[in-house]
Amino acid sequence: MIMDNSKTTSKTTLLKLMLLRAWKERWTDCQWGINVKTILTRGVSGDVYNLADAIIQQAVVGSGANMLFLSYLKHSLCAHLISHAAVLNRIAKYDQYDKHHCLIALLDFLKSIIDGVTCRGKQEEAILTKATVSLVHWLLQIYECVLQSYAEDSTLQPEEEEVVQRVAVVLERIVENPFLLGVLSIGKCDDPELFIALQKRFNGISNLTLTTGYVANVGAGNANSLTVTDCMRKLVLLEVDALEMRPFDGGKVEPITYSLQPLIAIEVLLNPMCDTHQYVAQLINLKRLKGFTYARLYCELMRGCLIALNNVEGTAKESLLCAFAFIKVPHILHQLHAKTNGAEQQDEATGATYSVEVLEAFELLLQDTPVLDYMDMKCACNVVECLLKEMVKLQLLTDTHVKQLVALREPVTAGLHKLDANSAPLTMMLKFVFRVESPLAGILKALSTDCSKVQDALLAMLCQVLTGNSLDLVLSVASVEGKFKAFISGLLKCNDYAKQATTAEIGKAPTTRSALFDVSFMILASIAQSYGSDVILAEGGNSFFEKWVRDYMVERKKTKSPMTMVKQADPMVLEELIMAMNNSEGMYVGLKASSLRWEDICYTIPALVHQVLMAWESESIAPLEIKKMLDGLKAYFSTFAVCAASWLCAYMQMVRQDEQLKPMNMVQQLCSALAGPLADEWQQQDYCKERFGLMGQIVRRMQQEFLRTPQVNPKLRALFPSQQQQHVVSHLPLEEQFEEAWKAIAERGWLPIETTFLLDTLLQSCGPAWLVEKLIGKLFVCKYVRDLNKTMDIIFAIMHLDIERCTIALLSQLVPMMLLNKAQTPDIVDPQSRVLAKLCVYCIIVTMETSLTATKKRTRGTASSELEDLDALCTSAKLRKIELDGMGVGCTEAATGGASGTEFSLDSALEPTASAWTTEAASIATLKEPLQSCLQTLFRTFAQHIATDELSPKVYFVFQFLSLLVESGRERIMCVLKLLPNGLVQSLLKINATDEMTVGLILRLYDLNTPSGRQFAMSDICLLRNIQMRKESIKL
C-alpha cells in the first residue's frame, strides 16, 4: 500500500501522520519501510526530520509501551533510516520513571540494539558521544529512583525488580563493549560538565547503597558476579588507560637484560662527572621501558656493576669502576628509594625501617651464583657483604639482613678457590676505595678553610695522595660521591693563595707555600687531562690556573696555536728569564735569585722554550746548555716542566715530521731524572719525589696524545716503550676495527672496557650514521628472537655514546632508507622488524628525556660544537678517515636548534602515580629540535607506504612502531603522536584491521583534550567498529 503525498505539509508532520495511520492499519515492518521512503528522499536521514523522536514519543504515550511502534523503530535502525545516536539520545530524555512497563520495554529495546551501536556518517559521530554519556546518566537515574523507592518502602515491587534487572543487563553490555567504552571516553573529554553530573549521580547512588544496604547483582547473581554499582563505577571512573590494548610482546618481562652493563660502562667511563640524580632519571626511564619492578631494577644495576668490574683489573679505570660499584650505587639506590616512595617495613628485632625492594633485589642477586662466584674468587672477599654494609650505612637495610644474606651466601663462598687476599689487585683496590673516603673528607675540609692557617697539613694531605694510584682513587671517589666540584673549587682557591707572596712570611712558610702551589697546579692539570678541562672551566672563574688551562694547556680535541702562546708573553719577563738561564750557576739559581711572579713565569715559558728551540735549530746553542736549562726549570718547580712540555707538544702538532725530533728530545729531558749537585739540592724540597712523579705522568700523557696524531715522525716511535703506545690509534681499516669490537662483545655478551673506548673513537671518527648502520647490520644477522633481543639491548646501550645523534641517524637516515630502498638494505620482516621498532621507540623516549634535561649528559668540550658544524655542512656520510679523535663525523639531517618548551625535571622522570599521569605528564613532555623535524620526516615516509591498500611487512612495521610507542610512552609521548599526519592512522586501520588494532590503541594515539584529537579518534573507532561488524556479518 503506497501513500499519496499530494498534500503540501511539512515532512515532519507527514511522518507523524504516517505513524498514526500505520498504527491504525497495523502495518507490518516491511510496509512501514516501504511507505516511509516515499517521504524521505534518497540519501536523506530520518534524523533530519526527528523520525526517531516521533516514533519513541508515540511508543510511550500510554502506561505501557506500544510494541508496534518499537518494531518500526528497530526496522528504521536496520534500514539505516535513522541513526543509533538519535535513538539513544531520545531514549535518554524519557523521564517518566514511574511508568515501569514503558521503562522495561525501552530497556529491552536497548538490550536488543546495544551490541550493534555504531556510526555511519560524520554528522552522527559528534552526536553519539553525548548520546552515550546521556544514556549512561539515564540508566543511573532509573537505578537511583528504584533505590529511593526501596529506602522508603524497604522492599521493591515486581516491576521495579524487573527494571533493575534490565538496567543491570544494559550496563553489563556497555561495560563489555570496547567501542562504547571508547565513545564514553571521548564523551568524557567532549562534555566535562555532563560527566561531572554523571559522577555526582553515582556518588548519590553509592550513598543510597550504603544507607539501604540494597545490592543488585549482574548476571546469575552468584557471589563472584559483578554488582550494578561495580558496572557503574567502571563507567563513571573510566580512563583511556583502562581500555584494552594488546601488549607488544604479550606483556612478558624479559628474564635477562643485556643493556645495563654496557650502559654502566659507557656512562661511568666516558661521563664520570654524571650526577646521581641523572642516573636516577635514566634508570627509572629504563625501568618503564623494560617493565621491571624496582627490585629487579636494583638487582640488574648491581649485577651490571659486578660484570663491568670483570676486566678492569690493572687498567687506569679500575678505581673509578670500583668506586662506582661500591660507593655510588648505594647512593643511587637510596635516592631511587626516596624519590619513588619505595615500600618500607620495620625490622622486628631492631625496630629500624628498611627498603623492601632493596631486600628483594639482594635476594634476586643471590640467585645469580656464577657472577657472584667469579667476583668473590677474583676479589678474594664476599662482594655481596661489601655492598650490604654500604646499604646499612644509608639505612636501606639493617644488620639483621646483612647476617641473613651473608649466611645464605657463606656455604657457597666457603668452597671457592680464592686468590691471595694480599696479592689480588681488585681486593687491594676495594680496600683502598673504602679507606679513601676519610682522607677525602679531610682534604675537602682543609680546602674549605683559610689555606694560610692549615697550609702545612694541607700540603701533607695532598702529597700523601700522590703516591701510587691514590690520586686516581681520590678523584674516582670524589666524582661518584658528587664532591668533585667542591674538590676543584678548593684546589683553585688553594693555588691562587699559594701563588701570592706575603711580606709577613718567616721560617719554612715560603717553602711550604711554593710546594703547595706546585702540587695544587699539577693535581689540577692531571684532572684536566683525565676528565677534560671543562670540569675546571665550569667554575666560571678567572683564576690563574683557569686562564692557563684555557689558553696554554695542550689538550685532546682542543687545538691551541703555539705561536699565539708565544705572542702573549711579557717581553720584560722573557728578558729576565733569559738572564736567569744565562746565570753562571745555572737556571735553577737564576730563578731563585729573580723576583718574578710564578704565574708570569708560567705564561712566559712558551716564549722562552721557543727561543731556545730556535737557537738549537740554528745551532747557536749547545744541547748541554739546553739540558741545564730544562733541568733548572723542573728542579725549581715541576709546574714549569709541565708548562714547557705543554707548549712543546702543541708545537710538534703544527710542524713537519723532520722538525719534531728536537722538541721531543726536550720533552724527554723534562721526564728524565735529575743528577749531580742539582739533584742534591732538589731533594731538599718538600715532597720532591711525589711532585716529580706526578709531573712525569702528566708529561707522558701529553706525549701519548701527540702520538695519536697522524703526522708523527716514525722515528719517534722508537723513543717510547711498547706500553706507552697502547692508546695509539689503530692503523686497521675502520670496518676491521668495528668487527673486532663486535666480536669482543658477541663472545662475552657484555661490553669490555677497551671496546668501549674503541667504539667511542669509531663514533668520533666515522660519525653516528656509519656506526648505527653497522650496528643495525648486526641486528639483522640474528635469526632467533632470543639473539635479536640480546643484540638489540646491547645496541641500545652502545647508542648512549651519543644517544641524540645516534637516534637522529637511525630515524632520519637508516629507517627511511630501509623503507624506500630495497636493494642496499636488509628487508624489514618479522621478527627483525619488531625488534627494530622497539629499538626506535626506546631511542626516541630516551632522547626526549636526555635532550630536555638541564645538564648535558656528555661533556665533550668544543668538539661538540665542531661536530655539529660538520654535521650541518657535510653532504655525505662517506668522509675521509681523520685520525684526530672527534673530528670525522657522518652527515645527519639534524639541524640543531633550541625550541622553547618546558624542560624535564627529575620529578617528571620519576614513576608517577595514577592521578599524576593525566595532569602532569602531558603538560611536561615537549619535543625539541632536531628530534622534532626528524620525526616529522619519518612520519611522512610512513604515510607514503600506507597510501596503498596492500598489507606488507613494511606497513606492519609502521603498526608495530606506533603500537610500541603508545605502550612504552603513555601520555609522555603525546607530543610525538601529535606529529602524525592526518589520516595516517585511518589508512593504517583500513589495511591492518586485525585483532591487534583495538579501540584502546586508537584512543591512545590521539590527544582527547583537543577537539581535533577527539574528532579523529571518534572517526577511527567508528571505522574499526564498522569493519569488525562487516566481518561478523560475513561469518553469519
From Swiss-Prot:
InterPro entries: Mediator_Med24. GO terms for molecular function: nucleotide binding; transcription coregulator activity. Component of the Mediator complex, a coactivator involved in the regulated transcription of nearly all RNA polymerase II-dependent genes. Mediator functions as a bridge to convey information from gene-specific regulatory proteins to the basal RNA polymerase II transcription machinery. Mediator is recruited to promoters by direct interactions with regulatory proteins and serves as a scaffold for the assembly of a functional preinitiation complex with RNA polymerase II and the general transcription factors. Keywords: Activator, Nucleotide-binding, Nucleus, Repeat, Transcription, Transcription regulation. Signal peptide: none annotated. It comes from Anopheles gambiae. This is Mediator of RNA polymerase II transcription subunit 24. GO terms for biological process: positive regulation of transcription initiation by RNA polymerase II. GO terms for cellular component: mediator complex. Pfam families: Med24_N (PF11277). Belongs to the Mediator complex subunit 24 family.
